[in-house]
């Protein structure tokens, strides 16, 4: 009888342990849902967005530096790999940003920020495709510079 109770206790504890092991995944931007239940405060959202925009500006400025080196017998295959890594980071950052509930009154700024982020992602994707085709990519420096300026301009909206 005691042995039977022990098994029930073990089974109960085991089921509790297993129920807490499921991986929690945030909502995707495609679902149209926010991963947070409540709006962040204006300060919290400003800090969060500026952190996300910093990820974008760092990746874009790195690619701008790489474009300068491509004309100096730079390893194009290596640049494709690095640019693809940057693209993955930017896409993940965009997905996270799109699912965070903005602060009160920041809906329009959020939408503008997402457009600027998606534009940078689009330029980076085109850059990778042109690198792969061995096309001239020197024109992307200006695109990335414009993206950088747009991203830093968006950061300024949240610092007011």
What is each stretch, according to the model?
Residues 31-78, 118-160:
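C-terminal amphipathic alpha-helix
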Residues 77-115, 160:
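Short, solvent-exposed, charged loop/turn and helix-capping segments
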Residues 22-24:
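Bacterial signal peptide processing site
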Residues 5-11:
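Sec-dependent signal peptide recognition
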């Amino acid at each position: 009888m005691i042995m039977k109770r022990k098994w029930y206790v073990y089974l109960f504890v085991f089921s509790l342990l297993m129920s807490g092991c499921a991986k929690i995944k945030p909502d995707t931007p495609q679902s149209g849902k926010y991963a947070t239940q409540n709006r962040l405060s204006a300060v919290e959202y400003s800090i969060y967005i500026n952190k996300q925009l910093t990820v974008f500006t760092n990746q874009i400025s790195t690619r701008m530096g790489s474009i300068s080196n491509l004309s100096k017998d730079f390893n194009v295959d290596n640049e494709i790999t690095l640019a693809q890594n940057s693209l993955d980071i930017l896409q993940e950052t965009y997905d996270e940003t799109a699912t965070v509930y903005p602060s009160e009154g920041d809906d329009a700024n959020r939408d503008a920020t997402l457009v600027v982020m998606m534009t940078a992602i689009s330029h980076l994707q085109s850059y990778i495709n042109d690198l792969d085709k061995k096309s001239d990519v020197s024109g992307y420096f200006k695109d990335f510079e414009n993206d950088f300026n747009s991203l830093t301009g968006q950061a300024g909206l949240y610092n007011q």
